[in-house]
Structures are given as C-alpha cells and as structure tokens.
C-alpha cells in the first residue's frame, strides 16, 4: 500500500507542475498556481501596521492584479484563485496566534454567493498555522458594499461589540 501512495503522490506532483500559470498561461513552477515571474510581479509588500493597540498584518498593495483577483474571488465565484490568495496570506509573518477568526458575511450575501470567501481562506491559513478557526463574531447588519467608508467602519466595529 505505501508503494501506491508514493506513486499517487508522484503522479499528482507531475500533473500539478504541468498546469499553466493562472496569470500568464505558461507552464508554471509550483508557486501557489502561478509561475515565478508572475509571483515576483505581484504587489506583495508584507508589513504590520499598529493602530489603536491592534496589529494589522498586510500582504500587499491593493492594486492590479491583486485587486482584480480578490474581486473575482469574492464577487464572481472565481474560486480557482484560492491557492494563490492563500499562498499570499501564507507569506505574511504572523505572530503566534491562538485561532483564526474569519470575517462573517451577512446571511443575504451567503445565500447569494453560496460561500464565505473569508472562511475559505481562513481554513487554509488555520491548517498552515495548525490553529483552530474561531467564529465568535456574528454579522448583525446586512451587507455593506454600497455604504460609505465611514459607515462601513462603524458597521465593522459594531460587529465586534
């Protein structure tokens, strides 16, 4: 049986490497579904921002192509971007955490999309960090996509009360 699992693992690796880069279409190396050239061109700039006793960990600048990929993943059910987005999150140097808390979405958005994009990414990150997912937060308000920025921040803070 171990021989078959080794053969299966080797076959999966070969098939995985033969898949094209999701950004440029050429055969890729194994970097979260993109080739090395495309990975190096992503606007990745991991940093930590300290705001009001909170540490906010940022993966990169919200500009092309990241902004486009995030919008497709979030609004257009382009779930094939999951490996790339998860890989980007894995590049952030996070302190030791006890759990991952995904941002909840409204029941209306969950019904529209059929999935919670932050939960999908949280599962990958929790697995990598070997920590549980914790969901103490419940969205009290409907979606806030069209709400002014200040109102969005207010809704965010209210969700954590």
Predicted regions and their residues:
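Glycine-rich phosphate/pyrophosphate-handling loop used in enzymes and phosphotransfer proteins
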Residues: 1-161
């Amino acid at each position: 049986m171990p021989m078959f699992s080794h053969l299966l693992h080797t076959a999966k690796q070969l098939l995985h490497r033969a898949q094209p880069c999701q950004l440029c279409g050429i055969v890729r190396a194994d970097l979260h579904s993109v080739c090395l050239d495309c990975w190096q061109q992503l606007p990745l700039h991991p940093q930590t921002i300290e705001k009001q006793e909170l540490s906010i960990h940022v993966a990169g600048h919200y500009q092309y192509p990241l902004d486009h990929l995030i919008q497709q993943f979030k609004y257009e059910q382009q779930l094939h971007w999951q490996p790339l987005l998860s890989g980007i999150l894995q590049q952030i140097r996070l302190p030791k955490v006890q759990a991952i808390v995904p941002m909840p979405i409204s029941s209306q958005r969950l019904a529209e999309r059929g999935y919670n994009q932050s939960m999908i990414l949280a599962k990958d990150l929790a697995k990598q960090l070997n920590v549980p997912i914790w969901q103490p937060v419940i969205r009290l308000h409907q979606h806030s996509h069209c709400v002014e920025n200040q109102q969005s921040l207010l809704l965010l803070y209210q969700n954590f009360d």
